[in-house]
Amino acid sequence: MNQRLSALVNGGYLSENEANKLMHDMMSGSLTDAEVAASLSILAHRGETAEEMTGFVKAMRQNAAPMEQSFDVVDTCGTGGDGLSTFNISTAAAIVASAAGAKIAKHGNRSVSSKSGSADVLECLGIHIQSTPEETRRQIQEKNMGFLFAPLYHSSMKQVAVVRKQLGFRTVFNLLGPLCHPMQAKKQIIGVYSKEKAKLMAKALAPLEPEHVLFVCGEDGLDELTITANSYVIELKKDVMTEYTLNPEDFGLEKGSLSDIQVQSPEESAKLIQNILNHQTEGAPLHITALNAGAALYVGGKSESLMAGTLKALETIKNGAAKEQLARLKQKTKEEEIYA
């Protein structure tokens, strides 16, 4: 039996280095499916430690496809798994934030458990998702936004894909994705499905020297800054961690209903996003997009506060800049035409 797995079976905890080695073993295919399943099951049952998570993140980053780092980009990504079937809020927010001047490197994938993954809805919107690393960097430079399709950068994840699907419950990999940005983005909005996991992820990321990151979780269970209830926030800025609660009404936004932001398909999500960007939708869909886009502008240094960022996001939608940005993102380059 793998010695790291043996430690877990016997009730032990892994050091950062041991966790790093265990993840390398998983990513390299050195473990049997049974050993992978046992490791993931034990961790899920007893809960991962922050030290273990840091070791896992380092290993995942080391196994990712090489891409030039950029500390200026912002990612809006979440763990998913909240089971609430909302439209792709972080994707809509990314488009608005990029229209307002933030450099967005959106990391995402197809749907696993939700009605619509970020890759699914971007395709429905007519935006190319499988660009090369070079083309993605060019898109970020020229259009303020590029999409990093997770399977292109984390191909070693295929070693555990079958086991994860067979297990059918959340594992540590649900938490690792947002912490393993291919460009090692130092500025992020990370949505988490529970307050406890948000704390764990923040503690795990802190040793990796993030510049400005918000971990957000709605009291309604949404892995976003929500509009139907208060939101819990952990803010990491350099080496300072603060925790607070946000009430959307403090931003001048009326609390809405969850049903107003739920969808049944990527196509329905894309339609709602188009209506938001065209400023043809008011209420909860508009407000939750502006709130999360405002957060991206805040961590990206384009606004001095969450409040200022939210107001800037609303104005970006109302003045037509967000609509124009969507049209710009849909325009294919010569390289994208070749790979389409």
Regions found by a protein language model. Give the residues of each.
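N-terminal basic/disordered segments at the start of proteins
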Residues: 1-15, 76-84
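A general structural signal for well-ordered alpha-helical segments in protein cores
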Residues: 2, 19, 36, 53, ...
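Glycine-rich anion-binding loops and their surrounding alpha/beta cores
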Residues: 7, 62-65, 86, 101, ...
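N-terminal glycine-rich anion-binding loops that anchor highly charged ligand groups
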Residues: 8-54, 61-69, 288
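Helix N-cap / loop-to-helix initiation motif
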Residues: 15, 32-33, 49, 90, ...
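Short amphipathic alpha-helical face segments that pack within enzyme cores
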Residues: 38, 92-96, 288, 292-295
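A glycine-rich phosphate/pyrophosphate-binding beta-strand-loop-alpha-helix module
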Residues: 40, 87-143
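Active-site cofactor/substrate anionic-group-binding motifs, chiefly glycine-
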Residues: 47-112
